Amino acid sequence: MVDRALADPAVRRALVPVVFGDGPTFERRATLRRLPVVAPGTALPPEGPARVAVTELPARDRAPGKPTTNGGKAQLAYVTAAVDSALRGEVDALCTAPVSKEQITRAGVRFMGHTELLAEAFGREVLMLMDGPRVKVALATNHVAIRDLPRSLEKSRLAAQLQLLSASLQPVLGRRPRIAVCGLNPHAGEGGLLGDEEIRTIAPAIALARRRGVDCTGPWPADGLFARPDHMPADVVLAMFHDQALVVAKALDFERTVNVTLGLPVPRTSPDHGVAYALAGKGKASATPMIAALLKAAQLASPRGRASRRATSTPRPRA
């Protein structure tokens, strides 16, 4: 999937890729795609045809479609190496391929996802945004069990997320974005009959964000808000939990919706799908999501994207 995406003409015009992964495996795939590969450490041209630098990491299990403990360790090693490179200022953006949280955890490391790892590595408060052609929806919580959602929502944090979302999109839109905020419960709580998180937490957070200059409304019942995505009275939605956001984003445009991490000093994007082990090594997986993620990373690394990040990179408070 990665090799096919990097061979795409639009991607080759847009960026110079540096691949963090298993060298021999990628070199073999790159040869099939006629992608030029340069040795690790070789200076890459700032312009011209895209070239690929393969980072040498210890060889791991190379059995496509077969999850292994060593494979989990390798996935984490590749992600960590890419993040370290970004921290050193060696790359302008990060585009992460899917990894298996289960296999990484089985390898002995509790891994909740790229977004959480990046927040910790950069020491920033971040926000996950599913950026699609028809709807943009951010997540107030990421990988949180349903039973833990009520205590995961906090007024000041929600207000800060709304500020981050507004500041991130304003340079792109040229104005303050209109943000619609979902409720947590069915029918946004129905006035407290179906839960009171909207009354106790979400509505006060919206009021606080509005006092800070954010154009936001809600809490709205999610089913009604997403019923007509092409006529939504907002530029972006803040959803309260993972599936409230991702079901809509994937249903509307699975292949072209990109996962963007807001709040980092460098852009980070990812395709909106998982590892798909059943398709690994068969050439059947669509490269369109990875192409979309790569092009979005290049766009966010542009001067306008850099201006947006300068306005939104907020250090996380030290404990």
Enumerate the language-model features and the residues they cover.
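Contiguous, glycine/small-aliphatic-enriched amphipathic segments in soluble metabolic enzymes
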Residues: 1-113, 156-240, 244-269, 273-275, ...
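Conserved hydrophobic/aromatic beta-strand scaffold that supports enzyme active sites
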Residues: 117, 128, 137-139, 268
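Flexible glycine-/small-residue-enriched beta->alpha junction loops
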Residues: 56-59, 124-127, 131-134
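Glycine/threonine-rich beta-strand-loop-alpha-helix active-site module
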Residues: 105-128
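Ligand-binding beta-strand-loop-alpha-helix segment within the catalytic cores
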Residues: 130-160
